[in-house]
């Protein structure tokens, strides 16, 4: 699996933004990706040193449209902890002109 196929998108929530101070970043990853694949992909894409990877599966939520019910897609989140001497990951453009 290619590195760009493993990491799908960053997760932007209040909790994940608070973790940025501790060099912990949250990403949605491929549901078949393992911890080692996530670690290698983050190190390859962002050129940083990963210390720890925590992975969790998120079940799909029940959604209704009138009398019809269905589920949203299941997903997998990875919380990546960087080493203290590693550079930060630039998730957003800070170029304010």
Swiss-Prot record:
One function term, GO molecular function aspect: structural constituent of ribosome
Protein's GO biological process: translation
Keyword annotations: Ribonucleoprotein, Ribosomal protein, RNA-binding, rRNA-binding
Keyword hit for Repeat: no
UniProt key word Chloroplast: no
Gene Ontology annotations for the cellular component aspect, listed alphabetically: ribonucleoprotein complex; ribosome
Family the UniProt entry places it in: Belongs to the universal ribosomal protein uL23 family.
Function: One of the early assembly proteins it binds 23S rRNA. One of the proteins that surrounds the polypeptide exit tunnel on the outside of the ribosome. Forms the main docking site for trigger factor binding to the ribosome.
Subunit text: Part of the 50S ribosomal subunit. Contacts protein L29, and trigger factor when it is bound to the ribosome.
NCBIfam families given in the database record: PRK05738.2-4
Protein name: Large ribosomal subunit protein uL23
Protein source organism: Lactiplantibacillus plantarum (strain ATCC BAA-793 / NCIMB 8826 / WCFS1)
